[in-house]
Design a protein with these regions (language model features):
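Extended basic (Lys/Arg/His-rich) segments that typically form rRNA-contacting surfaces
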Residues: 1-228
C-alpha cells in the first residue's frame, strides 16, 4: 500500500539520548492505526487518494445520517476523525477496510506534521508579531503600543498587510522536515525530533517530508605523516 501519510494524535514530549550522550527533544505521536474508509480514483474524482479514519470509535448516535451511511457503505465502524491522503501509485489496489499502520515509516527519514496550533486569544503586537516596544526608561509613556502604522498625506491610508494586535493561534500549521527518531510498532508510536503544533491530545496528520534532508557527509580523517 503506497499511502503517503497517516493520521494520529499528539501525546506529548519527552527526550531520548543519542549515542554520544546528548539529549534529543522528541514529540511522541500515536500514528494510527487507521482504516481506509473511501477510495478516490482519477476517473471519478480527478485524483488518486484514500480517506482514512483514525481508529477511535464513536457512538453511532453521535454522528449524523450522512456519515452513518458513509461508514455503512465502507463496511467499517463509525470513527471520530477522518482525513484524506494522496496515493503515490495510481495503480494501488487499496480498498475500504484496509488498515494503515506506522510500519510504513522508517527510522531516520523525515516527515511533515500538520495540526492546529494552540489558541492564545487576543494578543498585542509585542507577543503576536515580536514588536520591540518602546523605551522602558523613566518618563516613557510608550511601552507595548503598536506605534506608527502609516505615512503622512501619501498614501493617506494604512498599507495592506500591516501587523496589528488580534487573535493569535488556533491556525493550521505544519512543522516540516522532522526526523523520525524511534518507532514502536506494538503501541503504534512515532517519535520525531522537535516540536509539533497543537496541545497534547490534538489530532495531527503525518506525511513524508517534501524536502528530504541528506545525511551529513563526514570527510575522512587525513593520515598523519609518520615520525622519522
Amino acid at each position: 500500500m503506497a499511502v503517503n501519510g497517516i493520521l494520529g494524535i499528539k501525546l506529548g514530549m519527552t527526550q531520548v539520548f543519542a549515542e554520544d550522550g546528548t539529549a534529543v527533544p522528541c514529540t511522541v505521536l500515536q500514528a494510527g492505526p487507521c482504516v481506509v474508509v473511501q477510495r478516490r480514483t482519477r476517473d471519478k474524482d480527478g485524483y488518486d487518494a484514500v480517506q482514512l479514519g483514525l481508529v477511535e470509535f464513536i457512538k453511532p448516535q453521535r454522528i449524523n445520517k450522512a456519515l452513518t451511511g458513509h461508514f455503512k457503505k465502507a463496511g467499517v465502524a463509525p470513527m471520530r476523525y477522518l482525513g484524506e491522503v494522496r496515493l503515490q501509485d495510481a495503480k494501488d489496489e487499496t480498498k475500504p477496510g484496509d488498515r494503515v499502520l506506522v510500519d510504513g515509516f522508517q527510522v531516520g527519514e523525515y516527515v511533515d506534521v500538520s495540526g492546529v496550533s494552540k489558541g492564545k486569544g487576543f494578543q498585542g503586537g509585542v507577543k503576536r508579531w515580536h514588536y520591540g516596544g518602546g523605551e522602558a526608561s523613566h518618563g516613557s509613556m510608550f511601552h507595548r503600543a503598536p506605534g506608527g502604522i502609516g505615512a503622512s498625506s501619501f498614501p493617506s491610508r494604512v498599507w495592506l498587510g500591516q501587523h496589528f494586535p488580534g487573535h493569535m493561534g488556533n491556525e493550521r500549521k505544519t512543522s516540516k522536515t522532522l526526523r523520525v527518531v524511534k518507532i514502536d510498532s506494538d503501541e503504534n508510536l512515532l517519535l520525531v525530533r522537535g516540536a509539533v503544533p497543537g496541545p497534547s491530545g490534538a489530532y495531527i496528520y503525518i506525511s513524508r517530508a517534501k524536502k528530504q534532508k541528506k545525511a551529513p557527509q563526514v570527510a575522512p580523517a587525513k593520515a598523519k605523516p609518520a615520525k622519522k
